[in-house]
């Protein structure tokens, strides 16, 4: 009888230590089985699960392995300056007049109304109403009403009403053109404009103006036509 008791006790002890219990730790590497669905057996603690332990992957970006951070070309954008980007320089205190289109100097005491198109000099005390088209000099104390088209010199004390079309010299002090000259025609050399002005057009090149009076169309050197030729 005692041998049977010792035998069953040994078997029960072996089952308790070697066989996995319902929810206990168990031995070996196999995970513990789930608890019984009906709640049978003794209560046991839930299985303790530890996080997986992995060594970090070490690799050099130049050797092509791993995820070595952002690419060297993906640099951050350059931040804007503290005051922002300027869009245009500030205007002067008195504002812009109109200004020459290509490098012309600003007037000292006056202002441009239209400004010369190509590097015309600014007037010192006056102003252009239209301005010469190509490099005409500014008048000293007067002003152009239209201005010569190509490089005509400014009058000393008078003004053009239309101005010569191509490079004509300015009239002498005190005179003025009523209509102006045709293309490539110059003003009289050394002669003052007639007292009454030209009615239609200036005389041809190198022809002197009459001392007094005016042309009706184009008179000879010293007189005028009245409908027939003088003897």
Swiss-Prot record:
Keyword ATP-binding: no
Gene that encodes the chain: cut-2
Location of region: 12 X 4 AA repeats of A-A-P-[AVI]: 75-221
Compartments, as annotated in UniProt: Secreted
Described function: Component of the insoluble part of the cuticles.
Full protein name: Cuticlin 2
Sequence repeat residue numbers: 75-78, 79-82, 90-93, 105-108, 114-117, 121-124, 137-140, 153-156, 169-172, 192-195, 208-211, 218-221
Leader sequence residues: 1-16
UniProt domain comment: The small repeats A-A-P-[AVI] are also present in many proteins constituting the protective envelope of other species.
Molecular function GO terms recorded: structural constituent of cuticle
Superkingdom of origin: Eukaryota
Mod. after translation: Tyrosine residues can be cross-linked in vitro, leading to the formation of insoluble high molecular-weight complexes.
One GO cellular component term: cortical layer of collagen and cuticulin-based cuticle extracellular matrix
